[in-house]
Amino acid sequence: MANLRDIRKKIGSVKNTQKITHAMKLVSTSKLRKAEEVARNSRAYALKLDAVFDDVLSKMKNQGIEDIQSKYFRELERLEIKKVDIIFITADKGLCGGFNTNTIKKVLACTNEYKEKDIKVRLRGIGKKGNEYFSFNGIEVLDKINNLSSTPNYERAQEFMKKVVEDYLSGKTDKVIIIHNGFKNMITQEIRVKTILPIGYKIIHQNPQPNEVQETITSEPSGSEDEILDSLAEKYVEYSLYYALIDSLAAEHSARMQAMDTATNNAKDLVKTLTISYNKARQEAITTELVEINAGVEALK
């Protein structure tokens, strides 16, 4: 009977866990729909910003301005990279499968790749899980910020990028990249690595689909060429981080929805297995009792 009680308790415990994981799946599904819509709208803005860059650079080229002096731009093919800053984005919470682990693995892989080329690497972290991992393993993270990946905010992203841009413009770093998990569809996330500084022509032109960017830039930019490019570059860099945060959040909800769905299904399977074990143990107990009763009857004859 003690065995039956134990199995019954396990079944009850698993059923409670199943209810929790199912509820978390529903919450993540709801949040994912909202995050997906925000990511879609933000992508449209990002593509528009790329189109503005292309338009301005095209106008400058038509005017015979080939040599861009803006401090944000470099000829990537000729640039000698000695110092790289990696901005990584992870979640503030767990229970999302390999979402955080995959990002951390990519950061470590990129770090090792750069170090093999004698390139100095500095990390800047957004997200509690990533920051905790590197702190626990004794890996220095220059700037740490939590509660931003879970609630993307443009002003906070802008503030975070100020120090990054200052270090780049002062020569403390030669290149800045962002590594994060991106949203591909409801069931798929992919690791994305994007160079945001320096800005090169290959980075600017993202080959948007014709139906994604329908408007063209018709207004003439005012100010000097460098002023125009500096102003656009600041927006480009800031929004690159903000969009990465939005993209990462959508991917996080997608990963958590999948993880909770898997956990719910596993709980269902475990309940079935435990129920079979319970019924088997119950049948054995009944059989044992019947045998004992029959033995007692035979003894009284």
UniProtKB/Swiss-Prot annotation:
Subcellular location: Cell inner membrane
Molecular functions per Gene Ontology: ATP binding; proton-transporting ATP synthase activity, rotational mechanism
GO BP annotation list: proton motive force-driven plasma membrane ATP synthesis
Topology within the bilayer: Peripheral membrane protein
Cellular component aspect of the GO annotation: plasma membrane; proton-transporting ATP synthase complex
InterPro entries, alphabetized: ATP_synth_F1_ATPase_gsu, ATP_synth_F1_gsu
Top-level taxon in the UniProt lineage: Bacteria
Keywords tagged on the record: ATP synthesis, Cell inner membrane, Cell membrane, CF(1), Hydrogen ion transport, Ion transport, Membrane, Transport
UniProt-listed PANTHER family: ATP SYNTHASE GAMMA CHAIN, ATP SYNTHASE SUBUNIT GAMMA, MITOCHONDRIAL
Similarity comment: family membership: Belongs to the ATPase gamma chain family.
Task of the protein: Produces ATP from ADP in the presence of a proton gradient across the membrane. The gamma chain is believed to be important in regulating ATPase activity and the flow of protons through the CF(0) complex.
Subunit structure and binding partners: F-type ATPases have 2 components, CF(1) - the catalytic core - and CF(0) - the membrane proton channel. CF(1) has five subunits: alpha(3), beta(3), gamma(1), delta(1), epsilon(1). CF(0) has three main subunits: a, b and c.
Protein's UniProt name: ATP synthase gamma chain
